[in-house]
Amino acid sequence: MDFNMKKLASDAGIFFTRAVQFTEEKFGQAEKTELDAHFENLLARADSTKNWTERILRQTEVLLQPNPSARVEEFLYEKLDRKVPSRVTNGELLAQYMAEAASELGPSTPYGKTLIKVSEAEKRLGAAERDFIHTASLSFLTPLRNFLEGDWKTISKERRLLQNRRLDLDACKARLKKAKAAEAKATTVPDFQETRPRNYILSASASALWNDEVDKAEQELRVAQTEFDRQAEVTRLLLEGISSTHVNHLRCLHEFVKSQTTYYAQCYRHMLDLQKQLGSSQGAIFPGTFVGTTEPASPPLSSTSPTTTAATMPVVPTGAVLAPPEEAALCLEEVAPPASGTRKARVLYDYEAADSSELALLADELITVYSLPGMDPDWLIGERGNKKGKVPVTYLELLS
Amino acid sequence: MNIMDFNVKKLAADAGTFLSRAVQFTEEKLGQAEKTELDAHLENLLSKAECTKIWTEKIMKQTEVLLQPNPNARIEEFVYEKLDRKAPSRINNPELLGQYMIDAGTEFGPGTAYGNALIKCGETQKRIGTADRELIQTSALNFLTPLRNFIEGDYKTIAKERKLLQNKRLDLDAAKTRLKKAKAAETKSSSEQELRITQSEFDRQAEITRLLLEGISSTHAHHLRCLNDFVEAQMTYYAQCYQYMLDLQKQLGSFPSNYLSNNNQTSGTPVPYALSNAIGPSAQASTGSLVITCPSNLNDLKESSNNRKARVLYDYDAANSTELSLLADEVITVFSVVGMDSDWLMGERGNQKGKVPITYLELLN
């Protein structure tokens, strides 16, 4: 009981002392120990790192899961320490609907057939998205969260301790100053009171008393200074750890970029496959539809072919617009089958060669084409038998 | 008075018609009256139209969810649409993330490795955000709008005509019932006349409905075209994003020099020995990660089947005659061969050729 009471009183005293010091600082009535510039920089850098890491973390979470209801659900599961059930992604759900629609509308009709193909691609896109979310969460979000909940909490705690130590230190300094002032005042009193023996005795006692007080204050100051310096050192070491935090986060950022690249590469490949399938079924679409549909329906359908053709062609201009010539060639190669590097193409319109480096073309003929690095992205090399030359991409319909 | 009479007469007639239909409908349900069956072809068309409507609606709704997963944003857009006001252009999620990354990089210091990487990554995220917005707009215009127009336009018309057909059929069957019950010759003659009229109207309505229903085929053709447009929009989106990510990886691939610079900057500050040790392993892990990043670029190399220049990072002694010995810092030409182990490439130095391990190389453009 005594021990607890003493400790409680002691803590209350310390708390009160700190509160007084803090208040006097705010009113400008007390001096404040300033941290050195380097230390202040470290603190600012740590704050900045914490704030931006938090923002990037939150926004990446929103990017990966835009539905706030789903995020709340995942948060609850996490707090309850339960495994989050695997949710069907939006792409996968769309794929399912398309597949079921195709079954109902007739799998053998052109629309039904296309719905089936598109639904398979959408399902793969949905799976790729799920993988991306999982990988990005694991390699990017988790480390950022660990920093905020681990390292940063430690730094915050040590900073708070440092603040307390500094208040203690400044309180001791204030106390020492007061003691010295009192001592000085006490030593000047004898000049006026020497002639009276009783006053002289009292004056000496007071002087001795204040002297003891000064010594005690100085002792306390040394202790507080030592503790402050030690705490400052500990905090500084932790703050300098922010550099390794940056290195770690840089590595995580690379992982995120890698998983995002993988995601888009997969999606791009799935879309390429889909376009090839849709392009190859173009011939099948028209006759089937023509047989199954009445006359009035034919005109609208006939415009499907140009659209499909147009859907295939823009792949090339897209690559051309986005990339320098070298990379345009690379992007164009993405379209080509990896195995051979060459493709068959059907000529859409007649073309007269403008010079000997070009190949003349006749409408409806088939030629072999391939690209060369560094060549203008609007041209390919075409071969017909033993003849070879440049051919304009816009005159061709690439076949798989 | 005439007006009053006219209204009353019309009202009575309508009430009579309604009552007749109600009686006929009830008797059909109770099995006490005959029902004219629609021909099989018309039934098939009706079923097909119903099916098309249901699935078109589901696909449309789910595509909307796919393009805008946030239900709050969808509700907001819906309200704006109903109020016939233009929805304000909202910064989308990738753009916001990009903005945060750029701001963070600027504050951390563009000269530092992490800050530099954040800025580059942020710029790429912004471009992805722009591509994302374009995908949404294009898909909404070319795919969702036609589907919505079908549901709110064509299908509503079909539903209306279908209802009329139902009413005509009830009138026809009511007339048939009345004819059957007629006794007197005069009443019979009148009923026959009425029957011919209702039969004629029914046939006309059936024809109109059939024509509308047969339009479903052209609807399918139209939706097929819209589906192709949607595929094209998605294709463009993923091609663009893939290109952006490739560009970003190439920029980040120049990381070693940045890191060296950062290291020099860090070493300018007094760092305790223990802390240096802490940074060391991270740096090594970071370098390891960079090497791992290369295979992703190498996949591009394999697909492109093009020759590329590569710088050798470490000495390598050939283990057999199929391999090529390497010296650190030299530049060789490499290409991939179909069917070869993915950890190896074919390397050429002058007229010497052989397999080289990928992990020993740094690919150049």
From Swiss-Prot, chain A:
Residues with PTM N-acetylmethionine: 1
Record-linked SMART domains: BAR (SM00721), SH3 (SM00326)
Annotated GO CC locations: cytoplasm
Region: Membrane-binding amphipathic helix, residue numbers: 1-27
Subcellular location(s) per record: Cytoplasm
Gene3D superfamilies found in the cross-reference section: Arfaptin homology (AH) domain/BAR domain, SH3 Domains
Residue ranges of every copy of the BAR domain listed in the record: 24-287
SH3 domain boundaries: 340-400
Sites bearing Phosphoserine, chain numbering: 10, 400
Residue stretches in coiled coil: 205-234
Keyword terms: Acetylation, Coiled coil, Cytoplasm, Phosphoprotein, SH3 domain
Major subcellular location class: cytoplasm
UniProt cross-references to InterPro entries, sorted A to Z: AH/BAR_dom_sf, BAR_dom, Endophilin_B2_SH3, Endophilin_SH3RF, SH3-like_dom_sf, SH3_domain
Signal sequence bounds: none
Membrane-crossing segments per the record: none
SUPFAM superfamilies, alphabetized: BAR/IMD domain-like, SH3-domain
PANTHER family documented for this protein: DREBRIN-LIKE PROTEIN-RELATED (PTHR14167:SF68), SH3 DOMAIN-CONTAINING (PTHR14167)
Subunit structure: Homodimer, and heterodimer with SH3GLB1.
Family in the record: Belongs to the endophilin family.
Protein name as catalogued: Endophilin-B2
UniProtKB/Swiss-Prot annotation, chain B:
Gene3D superfamilies per record: Arfaptin homology (AH) domain/BAR domain, SH3 Domains
Domain (SH3): residue spans on this chain: 305-365
Pfam families named among the record's database cross-references: BAR, SH3_9
Domain BAR as annotated: residue spans: 27-261
Cellular localisation: Cytoplasm; Golgi apparatus membrane; Mitochondrion outer membrane; Cytoplasmic vesicle, Autophagosome membrane
GO CC, any one term: cytosol
Example of a GO MF term: protein homodimerization activity
Keywords assigned by UniProt, alphabetized: Acetylation, Apoptosis, Coiled coil, Cytoplasm, Cytoplasmic vesicle, Golgi apparatus, Lipid-binding, Membrane, Mitochondrion, Mitochondrion outer membrane, Phosphoprotein, SH3 domain
Coiled-coil residue spans: 155-186
Post-translational modification comment from the UniProt entry: Phosphorylated at Thr-145 by CDK5; this phosphorylation is required for autophagy induction in starved neurons and facilitates homodimerization.
PTM sites of type N-acetylmethionine: 1
Tissue expression: Isoform 1 is widely expressed. Isoform 2 is brain-specific. Isoform 3 is predominantly expressed in testis, but it is also detected in liver and, at much lower levels, in skin, stomach and ovary.
Membrane topology: Peripheral membrane protein
InterPro entries registered for this protein in UniProt: AH/BAR_dom_sf, BAR_dom, Endophilin_SH3RF, SH3-like_dom_sf, SH3_domain, SH3GLB1_BAR, SH3GLB_SH3
Sites bearing Phosphothreonine, chain numbering: 145
Required for membrane binding: annotated segments: 1-37
Residue numbers spanned by region Membrane-binding amphipathic helix: 1-30
One GO BP annotation of this record: negative regulation of intrinsic apoptotic signaling pathway by p53 class mediator
UniProt note: domains: An N-terminal amphipathic helix, the BAR domain and a second amphipathic helix inserted into helix 1 of the BAR domain (N-BAR domain) induce membrane curvature and bind curved membranes. The SH3 domain is required and sufficient for the interaction with UVRAG.
Family classification: Belongs to the endophilin family.
Further remark: Fibroblasts with a reduced level of Sh3glb1 show a defect in retrograde transport between the Golgi apparatus and the endoplasmic reticulum.
Record note on quaternary structure: Homodimer, and heterodimer with SH3GLB2. Binds BAX; induction of apoptosis augments BAX binding. Binds DNM1, HTT, AMPH, BIN1 and ARFGAP1. Interacts with UVRAG; UVRAG bridges the interaction to BECN1 indicative for an association with the PI3K complex II (PI3KC3-C2). Isoform 3 interacts with PPP1CC; this interaction leads to the inhibition of phosphatase activity.
Function: May be required for normal outer mitochondrial membrane dynamics. Required for coatomer-mediated retrograde transport in certain cells. May recruit other proteins to membranes with high curvature. May promote membrane fusion. Involved in activation of caspase-dependent apoptosis by promoting BAX/BAK1 activation. Isoform 1 acts proapoptotic in fibroblasts. Involved in caspase-independent apoptosis during nutrition starvation and involved in the regulation of autophagy. Activates lipid kinase activity of PIK3C3 during autophagy probably by associating with the PI3K complex II (PI3KC3-C2).
Full protein name: Endophilin-B1
Organism of provenance: Mus musculus
